[in-house]
Swiss-Prot record:
Keywords: Isomerase, Membrane, Transmembrane, Transmembrane helix. The lineage of its organism: Eukaryota, Fungi, Dikarya, Ascomycota, Pezizomycotina. One of its GO terms (molecular function) is isomerase activity. The gene is DEP1. Pathway: Polyketide biosynthesis. This is Terpene cyclase DEP1. The chain crosses the membrane at residues 10-30, 82-102, 116-136, 158-178, 188-208, 233-253, 297-317, 338-358. GO terms for cellular component: membrane. It comes from Fusarium langsethiae. Belongs to the membrane-bound ascI terpene cyclase family.
Length: 365
């Protein structure tokens, strides 16, 4: 019988490295990104903004990320943009998961207590690489065994910060909806999106400081804090599920071949430079279309690994085997949970399925 283990999260991170950056080494993605950041122009001759903070090394990194996010969020494509929209809401949910686990009173490590660094790296390097490693550390921690309680004032702040987290993806997608696709404003919002996790965590700390006067530690109730955590998870899961169902509906009922199920979710190519196999497209220059294919392949592998990671992580926490040196044998109901999680992930997406599963798990602690 298949059994989840926390080591599988490390294997998934390795798969993420290969899917995101391994193929990119062979299929021309790195060369195209380097050319654009060097010339400061996209293949379709649109200018690329290169000044954000006045700090050279930081601006260089933000410029590179602007290329990546611009191509996947502008109005020149439909399918790749729709998948990327879905991914960002799944990642918003995983950010909430990490924040909740960081608030447990049993957490001693600053590495886990302030997860903004992991959220930033998910945006900058790919969630498929960073997220499995961070969740492995969460599962390896004995914080929940020591003291799983979240202080009430911190739990009460979670629904507020959940709303803020769910609004974050709009920073990068809204410009295309309002006619500012690919503009300097769009690039500035992309840069803001990269540091948004730090701002959000700072906002959360500020809100909890204010709430601490109204919810002192002495008023802590086990049942009281859980309902706020569950409400946050259900809110995030509902929004992410709606986004994923919207994506699936669009793929199933559209006549646009760029938004079909296989186009969205099934990786094609890999080692081959897409410019060699592209079908002529009068709407996109060949070099730009090749870059879009490079980045879409990146997104597809990001999606696959995030889905698998959410299933493994949720199953580990539901089965109460996280933090243990030796995993206990799986029992029949755990196999059933795995099947339910997998089906839910397909239908609701990793953000929705994982969030609802963790809301159930919260009641079991």
């Amino acid at each position: 019988m298949f059994q989840t283990s926390r080591s599988q999260l490390l294997y998934l991170s390795a798969l993420g490295v290969w899917g995101l950056w391994g193929y990119a080494y062979f299929n021309g993605m790195f060369t195209r990104l380097d050319t654009i950041t060097r010339t400061l122009h996209f293949p379709d001759n649109r200018p690329l903004r290169d000044s954000y903070t006045g700090l050279g090394p930081l601006d260089k990194q933000l410029t590179l990320l602007s290329v990546f996010y611009d191509v996947l969020t502008n109005s020149l494509s439909s399918g790749p943009r729709l998948l990327f929209f879905d991914i960002n809401y799944a990642v918003a949910c995983t950010n909430l998961w990490t924040l909740i686990e960081s608030r447990r009173r049993g957490v001693r490590s600053w590495f886990l207590k302030y997860p903004a660094w992991a959220m930033v790296l998910c945006n900058a390097n790919g969630a498929a690489i960073v997220l499995p490693i961070y969740l492995y550390c969460v599962c390896r921690s004995k914080a929940r065994l020591r003291d799983p309680v979240v202080p009430l004032h911190e739990a009460v702040a979670l629904p507020i910060i959940t709303v803020v987290m769910l609004l974050q993806p709009l920073l990068i997608f809204a410009p295309a909806w309002f006619g500012y696709s690919g503009s300097e404003t769009h690039h500035a919002l992309i840069a803001l999106f990269q540091v948004a996790p730090v701002i959000v965590l700072g906002l959360y700390v500020g809100i909890t400081s204010l709430l601490s006067y109204h919810f002192p530690a002495t008023s802590l109730s086990s049942k009281e804090y859980k309902k706020w955590i569950s409400a946050s998870l259900i809110l995030a899961g509902s929004v992410a599920s709606a986004v994923h169902i919207y994506t699936l509906t669009g793929a199933l009922f559209t006549r646009d071949s760029d938004v079909s199920l296989t186009r969205l979710f099934v990786p094609t190519g890999g080692f081959t430079d897409p410019i060699k196999t592209l079908v002529s497209n009068e709407n996109l220059l060949a070099e730009y279309a090749a870059l879009l294919e490079n980045l879409h392949l990146f997104s597809q592998w990001d999606w696959i690994v995030v889905c698998l990671t959410s299933v493994v992580y949720a199953q580990l926490l539901l089965s109460r085997r996280e933090g243990l040196k030796v995993n206990k044998p799986a029992v029949p109901y755990e196999a059933q949970e795995m099947i339910y999680l997998t089906i839910a992930t397909v239908v609701l997406g990793p953000g929705g399925a994982g969030s609802f599963a963790l809301a159930i798990r919260e009641a079991r602690i």
